[in-house]
């Protein structure tokens, strides 16, 4: 989701359209035959269980798929085999991925004003991806609570050096409850990503951040952090919403001391793969409609909504077309991206190989925001793309997915390079009230996926993919 942060800030100002026309043939866009086929595709996807069954296997059976892990390698082999069973042309594209391994992660408050004699208090903490380790015995230091980067700067080295900084920037729960969880995430994620480097600049010995997520169940949300050249690397972790509140309150009473132990390791990069599978087009086989999701995940849970659901919905598209014995006019290319979570090396490898072939990428679709009820789809590229969606929205009307939102900042991290190169890009459009309650934390488990709703996601992705593959004219770009 790294390249989606700008888009997250723009989501509230996107242009959303609802379409009301009936599904009649528009020969310059979609033939009556294509529209009839799209209705069949939607019905098969919405009523089927393929995406649900595949997401269940990836998340509950294979489990967390951290880049470089045995589980990620197993998932690559599994998905490739499913595509071969469908008769697709399958390619494993080599990708060198980070190999960061989580270790011990504990934290305790050891001193605070008014504490009972001999008391300690456990803090829910998780290491952030790519963090360096504390000593094996941990570190103990006073905590300095800051609400934002400006407050950190005002305090300066005199008040920060030798201490552990808690960035207590609050995730915007009101924005999340209004359905704009991605925008709330976009506001807070900078503290997770850049907090350690900012604190180290003033001599901090470690940084902890209030989780960039909407859980209120005392769960810490992990995610990627980054260091900066020329600034010391210090350990970095995230604490739960509730623990951040407690520490911030205790800090108003007097000094607070914390003992922090984080022992992750960064091992040498390791070889992995994107899974690429083509369902050849009948008329324009050298033009591609990408349909995709990412196969890797974080390691605190099963990576169910992030992103077993998305990748399963994506590769349900060729399964549905095979079931209905439909062949698209353009090639539908499924991609299971590797390493979205830790830097996007899979996306970068694909774009590097295909840079000279960008004009033949007709459209790109990415599913990576959960598996709740979709209300339509988002698109990026030329604003004029909006005129192409009326018939598709009407096909999706029976399941209430008629909205199309223009999001110029982009709609997906892994297809981001294609979007920036001018390829029209699409993603399912969700109400984001619940996604960030489970995002990157220990509750991202298969029970969060509803059988009916992932079928609806599959339907949106399949209708978009087949509609773009059979469009009668080029898209503006």
Where in the sequence are the language-model features?
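His/Asp/Glu-rich mid-to-C-terminal helical/loop segments that flank catalytic regions of hydrolases
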Residues: 319, 323, 436-477
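Extracellular/luminal Protease-associated
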Residues: 69, 120-235, 302, 403-404
């Amino acid at each position: 989701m790294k390249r989606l942060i700008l888009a997250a800030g723009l989501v509230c100002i996107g242009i959303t359209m609802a379409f009301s026309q009936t599904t009649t043939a528009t020969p310059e866009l979609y033939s009556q035959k294509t529209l009839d086929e799209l209705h069949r595709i939607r019905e098969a996807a919405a009523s089927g269980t393929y995406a649900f069954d595949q997401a269940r296997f990836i998340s509950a059976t294979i489990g967390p798929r951290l880049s470089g892990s045995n589980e990620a390698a197993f998932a690559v082999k599994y998905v490739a085999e499913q595509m071969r069973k469908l008769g697709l042309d399958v390619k494993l594209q080599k990708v060198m991925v980070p190999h960061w391994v989580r270790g011990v992660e504990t934290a305790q408050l050891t001193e605070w004003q008014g504490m009972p004699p001999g008391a300690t208090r456990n803090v829910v903490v998780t290491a952030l991806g790519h963090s360096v380790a504390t000593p094996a015995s941990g570190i103990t230091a006073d905590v300095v609570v800051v609400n934002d980067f400006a407050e950190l700067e005002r305090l300066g080295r005199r008040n920060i050096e030798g201490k552990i900084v808690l960035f207590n920037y609050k995730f915007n729960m009101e924005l999340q409850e209004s359905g704009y969880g991605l925008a709330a995430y976009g506001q807070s994620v900078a503290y997770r990503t850049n907090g350690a480097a900012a604190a180290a600049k003033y001599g901090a010995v470690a940084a902890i951040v209030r989780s960039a997520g909407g859980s209120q169940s005392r769960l810490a949300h992990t995610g990627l952090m980054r260091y900066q050249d020329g600034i010391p690397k210090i350990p970095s972790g995230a604490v739960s919403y509730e623990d951040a509140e407690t520490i911030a309150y205790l800090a108003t009473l007097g000094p607070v001391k914390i003992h922090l132990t984080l022992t992750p390791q960064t091992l040498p990069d390791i070889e992995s793969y994107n899974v690429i599978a083509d369902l050849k087009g009948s008329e324009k086989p050298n033009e591609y409609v990408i349909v995709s999701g990412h196969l890797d995940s974080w390691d605190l849970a099963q990576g169910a909504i992030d992103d077993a659901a998305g990748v399963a919905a994506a590769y349900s598209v060729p399964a549905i077309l095979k079931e209905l014995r439909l062949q698209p006019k353009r090639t539908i290319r499924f991609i299971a991206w590797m390493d979205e979570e830790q830097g996007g090396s899979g996306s970068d490898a694909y774009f590097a190989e295909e840079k000279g072939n960008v004009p033949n990428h007709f459209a790109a679709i990415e599913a990576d925001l959960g598996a709740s009820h979709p209300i339509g789809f988002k698109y990026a590229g030329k604003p004029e793309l909006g005129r192409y969606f009326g018939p598709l929205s009407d096909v999706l009307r029976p399941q209430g997915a008629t909205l199309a939102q223009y999001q110029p900042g982009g709609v997906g991290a892994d297809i981001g390079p294609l979007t920036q190169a001018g390829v029209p890009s699409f993603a399912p459009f969700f109400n984001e009230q619940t996604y960030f309650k489970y995002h990157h934390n220990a509750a991202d488990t298969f029970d969060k996926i509803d059988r009916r709703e992932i079928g609806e996601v599959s339907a949106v992705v399949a209708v978009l993919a087949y509609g773009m593959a059979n469009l009668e004219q080029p898209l503006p770009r």
